[in-house]
């Protein structure tokens, strides 16, 4: 329940603040939020959110396992969460950790350390208007989620892999030009892609052709969040 609450806060905060945001949940009761403006149009890009039509039914255990396994690693060091565990100490303890918590927990912890670092680099790239680095980090983070966090599909239903299919299509159309990755908690649902305007028609055709008309939603990132609307405006 607490995990779902934090995830919901992330969605609501992103909408309320606008732009590219960072949220530090070190103190879940008082998260620290940062904001950076981004201008996709300036670089000739749009953002696409594509619905892979997957079902989120029976995925509760998959979502919960990610947190449970990362916390199991932290417990080996007498800590509650991984951010309290020194990364170098984690790597020194790999032989012990593999036996104690299993390999999936270990590689998910590796993803945690790398992705926390990547998030800071991504935010810096946006602030510095380094769009090439921004795209590269989006792709790197997506690969890490797929390969190491292992949340692109549920192992309980390996025949249903809509997210990987959408990612593979995205790579086919955008390789060398844009960026793509799974979105949110993963396992099913949506992916995001940053698409050059000149490739938008081809990208939409590929996604809609696979998942159905209207599956690819073309968006922009609004740099203004929630604003008051009054009758005199």
Whereabouts are the PLM-identified features?
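Short, small-residue-biased leader/transition segments that mark boundaries at the very start
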Residues: 2-6
């Amino acid at each position: 329940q607490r995990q779902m609450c934090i995830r919901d806060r992330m969605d609501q905060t992103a909408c309320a603040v606008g732009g590219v945001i960072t949220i530090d949940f070190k103190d879940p009761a008082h998260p620290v939020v940062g904001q950076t403006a981004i201008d996709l149009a300036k670089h000739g890009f749009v953002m696409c959110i594509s619905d892979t039509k997957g079902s989120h039914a029976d995925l509760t255990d998959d979502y919960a396992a990610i947190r449970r396994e990362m916390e199991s690693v932290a417990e080996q060091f007498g800590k509650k969460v991984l951010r309290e565990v020194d990364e170098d100490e984690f790597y020194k303890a790999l032989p012990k950790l593999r036996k104690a918590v299993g390999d999936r927990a270990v590689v998910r912890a590796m993803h945690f350390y790398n992705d926390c670092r990547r998030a800071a680099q991504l935010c810096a790239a946006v602030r510095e208007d380094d769009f090439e680095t921004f795209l590269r980090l989006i792709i790197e983070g997506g690969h890490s989620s797929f390969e190491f966090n292992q949340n692109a599909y549920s192992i309980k239903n390996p025949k249903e892999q809509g997210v990987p299919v959408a990612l593979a299509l995205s790579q086919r159309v955008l390789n060398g030009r844009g960026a793509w990755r799974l979105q949110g908690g993963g396992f099913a649902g949506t992916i995001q892609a940053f698409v050059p305007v000149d490739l938008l028609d081809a990208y939409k055709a590929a996604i809609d052709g696979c998942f159905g008309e209207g599956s690819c939603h073309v968006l922009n990132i609004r740099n203004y969040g929630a604003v008051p609307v009054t009758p005199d405006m």
